[in-house]
C-alpha cells in the first residue's frame, strides 16, 4: 500500500510541516493544503495534528516500466497492438473506479493517470471498480502531454476523446496499437493534451443530451477499440 497524497492544514507552517512536504515531494507524492474541516473528515475522528496521508490500496507503477512489460520494443508494440487508456484529471473517485472496471472488462493492457489533479485510488474508487482495479497495471505521469509524445515514439496511435470531433468512434482505426485519452468531467482534455493527440474522436449522440458521463464514454470507446482484438 502506497501513499496517494499528503494533506496539510491550510496555512500550516514550521519545520515539521516543511520536512513532511519535502519528503513527500522528493518521493513524487502530491501535497495539498486543505481546511481543517477537510482534515477532520479524512481522519475520521483520529487525531491528525494538521497532517493526513491518503493511502492507495494499489501501488502505482512507473510509466516506462509498465510500457516495457506490455511491449518492450517498437516491433513488439506493432505485433501485440496493445490498448492503453490515459485519464486526464478525472476528479471523482467513483468515476475513476467505474472507468477501471470498464478498462479491465475490455482487456486494456494498462492505464496512465496524472500525478496531480487526479481522483485518489481510495476505497470509493475500488468499490466502484467492483474490485477489479488490482487486475490492471496503473502508472502515473508528471506530464501527460510529454508522455503521449513518448507513446507515439513507441508506435502507439493516440486518440483523444472530444465531444465535438468530426471523427466518430465508429470511424476510428482501432486495429493497431492505440492509446485512448479521456478528459476530466467538467473541462475535458487539457489544451496541451489535445495538441499531443494524433486525432480526436467523438461518440455520436442521437438523443437530446449534450454529453455522457466520463465512465460511460470510457466503456464505449474501450469496447470499440477491443472489437478487432477479440
Where are these regions (language model features)?
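Short amphipathic alpha-helix with an adjacent loop that forms part of the alpha/beta core around
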Residues: 65-76, 150-152, 170-173
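Active-site/ligand-binding-proximal alpha/beta "capping" segment
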Residues: 159-215
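Short basic, glycine-rich beta-strand/loop surfaces that mediate nucleic-acid
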Residues: 42-56, 129-132, 137, 175-183
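Structured adenosyl-cofactor binding patch, chiefly the S-adenosyl-L-methionine
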Residues: 105, 110, 120, 124-132, ...
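A short acidic, often aromatic-flanked loop/helix-cap motif at beta-alpha or helix-coil junctions
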Residues: 37-42, 59-61, 144-147, 167, ...
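A residue-level signal for conserved active-site and pocket-lining positions in enzyme catalytic cores
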Residues: 53, 125, 158, 181, ...
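N-terminal positively charged helical leader segments and presequences
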Residues: 1-72
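RNA substrate-binding interface of SAM-dependent RNA methyltransferases
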Residues: 1-30, 76-167
Amino acid at each position: 500500500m502506497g501513499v496517494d497524497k499528503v494533506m496539510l492544514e491550510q496555512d500550516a507552517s514550521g519545520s515539521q510541516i516543511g520536512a513532511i512536504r519535502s519528503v513527500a515531494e522528493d518521493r513524487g507524492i502530491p501535497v495539498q493544503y486543505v481546511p481543517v474541516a477537510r482534515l477532520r473528515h479524512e481522519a475520521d475522528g483520529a487525531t491528525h495534528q494538521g497532517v493526513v496521508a491518503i493511502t492507495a490500496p494499489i501501488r502505482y507503477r512507473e510509466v516506462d516500466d509498465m510500457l516495457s512489460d506490455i511491449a518492450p520494443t517498437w516491433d513488439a508494440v506493432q505485433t501485440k497492438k496493445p490498448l492503453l487508456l490515459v485519464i486526464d484529471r478525472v476528479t471523482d473517485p467513483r468515476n475513476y473506479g467505474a472507468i477501471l472496471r470498464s478498462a479491465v472488462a475490455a482487456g486494456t493492457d494498462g492505464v496512465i493517470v496524472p500525478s496531480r489533479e487526479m481522483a485518489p485510488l481510495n476505497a470509493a474508487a475500488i468499490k466502484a471498480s467492483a474490485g477489479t482495479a488490482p487486475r490492471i497495471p496503473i502508472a502515473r505521469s508528471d506530464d501527460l502531454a510529454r508522455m503521449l509524445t513518448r507513446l507515439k515514439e513507441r508506435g502507439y496511435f493516440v486518440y483523444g476523446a472530444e465531444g465535438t470531433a468530426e471523427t466518430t468512434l465508429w470511424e476510428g482505426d482501432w486495429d493497431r496499437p492505440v492509446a485512448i485519452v479521456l478528459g476530466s468531467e467538467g473541462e475535458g482534455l487539457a489544451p496541451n493534451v489535445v495538441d499531443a493527440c494524433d486525432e480526436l474522436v467523438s461518440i455520436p449522440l442521437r438523443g437530446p443530451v449534450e454529453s455522457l458521463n466520463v465512465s460511460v464514454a470510457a466503456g464505449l470507446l474501450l469496447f470499440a477499440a477491443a472489437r478487432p482484438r477479440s
